[in-house]
Amino acid sequence: MRVLVAGGTGFIGSALVRALRGDGHSVTVLTRNPDKARLPDGVRAAGWDARSPAGWGHLIEETDAVVNLVGENLGGGLWTAKRKQRIRDSRINAGRAISQAIQAARQRPAVLVQSSGIGYYGFSGDTFVDEASPAGSDWLAQVSVAWEDSTRAVEDLGVRRVVARNALVLHGREGIFPLVLLPFRLFVGGPIGSGRQWFPWIHLDDAVQATLFLIKNQDASGVYNFSAPDPVTNDKLGKTIARVMRRPYYFPVPAIAMKTVLGELSTLVLEGQRAVPARLQELGYIFRFPTMEGALIDLLR
C-alpha cells in the first residue's frame, strides 16, 4: 500500500511511519523541511507549505491512503491570542490543502485518516462521552469541529474518511506525558486541582496500531475515539504513577497555581473528558494497553 503522511515527523507521525515501513508499505512524508527530515530508510520526503496543494498535489494520484496529523502542539506554549490563532490555522489550513489536492486528483486515495482531538467534546464532568456525544462550546472544541470539517468534502468524492479523536497520547520521552511524570521523578508528586477531573489517554502504540487497523478495515468510516477503555481521574493517575515509580504522593498543586502560571492552557490538566472508545471496540480493535497501570509499566521500563 502507498501511504502519504502529513505530519510524519512529529512523535506520533514518526512512530506511524516506522510501523508502516515495518509492514512493508511505501511511505511518503509531507514536511516543510524535506532536506532536514530524519526519516527511516526507504521513506520519501516531499516539501509542502501546509497551506496549499502547490508542488505536491500530484502525489495524491500515487497514493492509496492519506493520514493527516498536522497541528501545532497544544502544549508548546501559553495560549496567547497569537498562539491560539496558530493552533487553529495550522490544523484547518493543512486539512483544506489535503482536501483540495484530493478534489483535483484524477485518481483518488481509497481512505483519508483525519486527526482530531478528544477536546471536541468540551468538558463533560463525570458523564461518559462516546462518538455520539455532541461537541462542546469552548474554544478547543470549536477548533476541533473546524479541524474535522476541513476535510469533510472528500466524503462526497467517494473517499472513505476516518476521523481519529485523539486523547492525550502517552510516550515516556516525548509529548506532554514527561511533564506529568516530572514531579514524581523529583519526589514531589500529588493531585492537581481537585484531582477529580478526568484524564483521557492512549498509549502511543495503540494510537499507531488503531490507525493501521482503520486504514486496512474497509468497513471503518466516520469518527473514532482514540482513547483507552480505562479513563482515569487525575487522582487515580497520580496514585498509579506513584505506585509504579515507588514515589510519594503528598504534594497537591492548587488549581489557582496552575491557572496563574499557565493561564487558559491549564484547562488541559484541570478539566477533561471521561471518553471511551465505543466504536473502535465495536469494530474489533483490541487494545495492547487497556489500563493505565499496564501502560505505565511499559512506558517506564
What does each model-identified segment do?
Residues 267-301:
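C-terminal amphipathic/interface module of NAD(P)-dependent oxidoreductases
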Residues 135-140, 166-174, 194-204, 215:
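Glycine-rich "substrate-gating" loop/helix at the edge of Rossmann-like oxidoreductase active sites
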Residues 181-189, 197-231:
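Alpha-helical substrate-binding/gating segment
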Residues 116, 149-172:
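Conserved beta-loop-beta element that borders a ligand/cofactor-binding pocket
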Residues 35-39, 43-94:
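NAD(P)H-binding glycine-rich loop region in Rossmannoid oxidoreductase-like domains
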Residues 84-86, 96-138:
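Conserved Rossmann-fold NAD(P)-dependent oxidoreductase catalytic core, especially the SDR/UDP-sugar
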Residues 217-264, 297-300:
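Mid/C-terminal beta-alpha module of Rossmann-like enzyme folds, strongest
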